[in-house]
């Protein structure tokens, strides 16, 4: 079999020659590594990976093909994909398409047959690097120039780019073996407005499972419009990019939280709640991307394994007096959760909805439900 040549170039001058397993052409972005062993389709379709080239450290990727039920959004958001080995055969009764065909259909430039261990060590030691994947006609100097010309994610507002353009209702529950995605429960007593900063579908499904009528709104929706919907709670979704430029979201969240409506944030939503409460955020060296990150609940001291995907973090040293730290990473000590002490608002940096990953932190969704019950804080 004849393979199209491909090249990954990093801004530090590192070059990796391999083969193309996706669309021809060129892509640039911030190169990060993800340590999850499974869930490559969920990772590719997670809007939080916009403008990022994802390196998967597990050596065999593509074994189970792809299928429509495992998508976390309507398309691939990752800027590119880097893997070690693409198996020649797909083995899964759920598979509808091979990974290379899927990548080609969505125009994703991807490379295989490179030393991902060497690449991961570079990213771990030097930090996330801007990079370029070139597939087809290879020009090393042009690839290096493209990598070095990428401005980086610091200061980049991507939430409004990946957000929905229209308000819509979400009624699909989580997937079950043998029955597919569950319909909404007959009784849905809680009206939740979910801000879409790049929301994953499984987050919305877990809200539906818990009896929420979910209305999804664009990232730039003013607080007044959300409050006019008279929600029982407001959810702040995950998303890509730097939270600090999202002034529209920060001001809206501040106004909503001040009304006393229960508010729950995940990932970018966590960072935005922190900023709206007076804290600051920082760019991490290489971020957290994987499904095996230990996090400790600071109240119960319980350790949970979580799914993580973020390159920015709330700076714990900048938390104001009305915000307490609730969770901390056991990998590097970074802040993983906060709660307002004067309002029913809290957030978590990781992904309690997993997809892919463990469900140890899923009870945070139940905490959100408790806040919306009549005996909760607001009522």
Curated annotation (Swiss-Prot):
Small subunit of the glutamine-dependent carbamoyl phosphate synthetase (CPSase). CPSase catalyzes the formation of carbamoyl phosphate from the ammonia moiety of glutamine, carbonate, and phosphate donated by ATP, constituting the first step of 2 biosynthetic pathways, one leading to arginine and/or urea and the other to pyrimidine nucleotides. The small subunit (glutamine amidotransferase) binds and cleaves glutamine to supply the large subunit with the substrate ammonia. Pfam families: CPSase_sm_chain, GATase. It comes from Thioalkalivibrio sulfidiphilus (strain HL-EbGR7). L-glutamine binds at residues 48, 239, 241, 268, 271, 309, 311-312. This is Carbamoyl phosphate synthase small chain. The gene is carA. Keywords: Amino-acid biosynthesis, Arginine biosynthesis, ATP-binding, Glutamine amidotransferase, Ligase, Nucleotide-binding, Pyrimidine biosynthesis. Composed of two chains; the small (or glutamine) chain promotes the hydrolysis of glutamine to ammonia, which is used by the large (or ammonia) chain to synthesize carbamoyl phosphate. Tetramer of heterodimers (alpha,beta)4. It comes from the Bacteria. It catalyses: hydrogencarbonate + L-glutamine + 2 ATP + H2O = carbamoyl phosphate + L-glutamate + 2 ADP + phosphate + 2 H(+). InterPro entries: Anth_synth/Amidotransfase (IPR050472), CarbamoylP_synth_ssu (IPR006274), CarbamoylP_synth_ssu_N (IPR002474), CarbP_synth_ssu_N_sf (IPR036480), Class_I_gatase-like (IPR029062), CPSase_GATase1 (IPR035686), GATASE (IPR017926). One of its GO terms (biological process) is 'de novo' UMP biosynthetic process. PROSITE patterns: GATASE_TYPE_1 (PS51273). The active site is at residues 267, 351, 353. Transmembrane segments: none annotated. Residues 1-187 are annotated as: CPSase. GO terms for molecular function: ATP binding; carbamoyl-phosphate synthase (glutamine-hydrolyzing) activity; glutaminase activity. Its EC number is 6.3.5.5. Belongs to the CarA family. Residues 191-378 form the Glutamine amidotransferase type-1 domain. Pathway: Amino-acid biosynthesis; L-arginine biosynthesis; carbamoyl phosphate from bicarbonate: step 1/1; Pyrimidine metabolism; UMP biosynthesis via de novo pathway; (S)-dihydroorotate from bicarbonate: step 1/3.
């Amino acid at each position: 079999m004849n393979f199209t040549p491909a090249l990954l170039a990093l801004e530090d001058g590192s070059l990796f020659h391999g083969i193309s397993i996706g669309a021809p052409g060129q892509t640039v972005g911030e190169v990060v590594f993800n340590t999850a062993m499974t869930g490559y389709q969920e990772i590719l379709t997670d809007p939080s990976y916009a403008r990022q080239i994802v390196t998967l450290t597990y050596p065999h990727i593509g074994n189970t093909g792809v299928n429509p039920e495992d998508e976390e959004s309507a398309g691939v958001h990752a800027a590119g994909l880097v893997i070690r080995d693409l198996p020649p055969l797909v083995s899964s009764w759920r598979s509808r398409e091979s990974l290379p065909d899927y990548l080609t259909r969505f125009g994703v430039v991807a490379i295989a047959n490179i030393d991902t261990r060497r690449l991961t060590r570079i990213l771990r030691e030097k930090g996330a690097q801007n990079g370029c994947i070139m597939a087809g006609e290879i020009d090393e100097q042009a690839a290096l120039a493209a990598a070095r010309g990428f401005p980086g994610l610091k200061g980049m507002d991507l939430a409004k780019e990946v957000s929905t353009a229209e308000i819509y209702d979400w009624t699909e529950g989580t997937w079950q073996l043998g029955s597919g995605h569950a319909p909404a429960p007959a009784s849905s007593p809680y009206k939740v407005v979910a801000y879409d900063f790049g929301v994953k579908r499984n987050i919305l499904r877990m809200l539906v499972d818990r009896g929420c009528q979910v209305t999804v709104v664009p990232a730039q929706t003013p607080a007044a419009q959300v409050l006019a919907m008279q929600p029982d709670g407001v959810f702040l979704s995950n998303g890509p990019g730097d939270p600090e430029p999202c002034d529209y979201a920060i001001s809206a969240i501040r106004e909503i939280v001040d009304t006393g409506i229960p508010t729950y944030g995940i990932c970018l939503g966590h960072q935005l709640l922190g900023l709206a409460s007076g804290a600051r955020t920082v760019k991490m060296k290489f971020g957290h991307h994987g499904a095996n990150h230990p996090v400790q609940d600071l109240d119960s001291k319980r350790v949970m394994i979580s799914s993580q995907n973020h390159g920015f973090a709330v700076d714990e040293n900048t938390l104001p007096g009305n915000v307490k730290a609730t969770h901390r990473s056991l990998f590097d000590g970074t802040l993983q959760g906060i709660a307002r002490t004067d309002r029913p608002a809290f957030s978590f940096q990781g992904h309690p909805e997993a997809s892919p990953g463990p469900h140890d932190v899923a009870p945070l969704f139940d905490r959100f439900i408790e806040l919306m019950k009549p005996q909760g804080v607001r009522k």
